[in-house]
Amino acid sequence: MHCKFLDHGVAISYDQVVKPCCVWKYDSSWATQNQLGSINLDTWHQSDQVIKIKNQLAQDSWPSSCEHCYNIEKTGRGDSIRLNGAQSYAEYSGDDITLEIRPGAVCNFACQTCWPEASTRVAQFQHQAGIIDIKDVNSQSISNFDFLLPFVNRIRNVVLLGGEPFYDKNCLKFLDWAAEHLSANITMFTNGSMIRWDWIKNYQHPITVVFSIDAVGTPAEYIRYGTEWDTVYQNFQEIQKYNHVELRVNITTSAYNYIYVQDVVDLLLVKWPSVVSFGVPGDAYLGTQVVPDQCRADIVTSLNRSIEKIKSTPIELGQQQNAVNALQSIVDALETNNYDHVLHQKFKKFVQDMDRVKKINIQDYCKFVANMLAQ
């Protein structure tokens, strides 16, 4: 096995630890040795620790840090970060770099499946609910990007994360810095609530905008708390008018939205984006095991319906297979994994805690999930 990110990836995490990709799992030893301010980014891919990981993969042995991709690929899915990188960066030369950078974590949403380091609002609400102590959230911002200048000509692609890139002030600073210094393709993940249209129009190089959409309409306004669906949908439609912008969509599948994924699929089937990816939260209490047996048939039926629609629509074959495999893996899990009452109660308490501090009620937005929690 080989991973392009071990040759070309530079991902700067919340705590300014450098790693090959966004899903790289690291321990305290890696964090100590790979702090942004103490390594040479220009030669980092030739370091002993990175070469050791390359050699292990070459022996078809999965490093523990690659757990995320292993869990996806073992199910037969072809949309892991590693496999996506093999396709996306196939033409990279030895010096080309993909930079993933998170200048800040300020966000105007508090999505139910998000985590404190990625959203200041999530951190605030979870702190209010007593789930975390906000003082323990290690999410550092970056406001000066000139440290990238020594190898700026090697940066071929940038993945910009937040917070919300069009809301966080340091992300906006990076966009302005990029317009002045970079000739790279820029990919950014957005909640779709606000787009800086002047930057979209004026950036002289290719742009990829990844909309995070987990549901449509009223359920979206609960699951991705902060959403005004009409605004997100309008921006989703508007971005497709720009020829230099590639549209992608990421769907995070969880117990919150298994039943609502069909609505997102129906929306996308009108004009399937270049890439549709499916994310999975890391917490077991957001997964299939929390779904009571009596609620599973309805979800399976809706997902199977979506699978058949995808199969019968003329979509690029690889994308079609990835979408089918992602949904089929949920169906298989619902049909084989036993219900876990302890996890169900943990999910129920999490929902209650979030509803309390956000002053909302899931019953008003997601009746199926509310009824599922009442079982």
Task: Map each language-model feature to its residues.
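Local cysteine-cluster metal-coordination motifs and their immediate loop/turn environment
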Residues: 5, 19-23, 62-74, 106-117
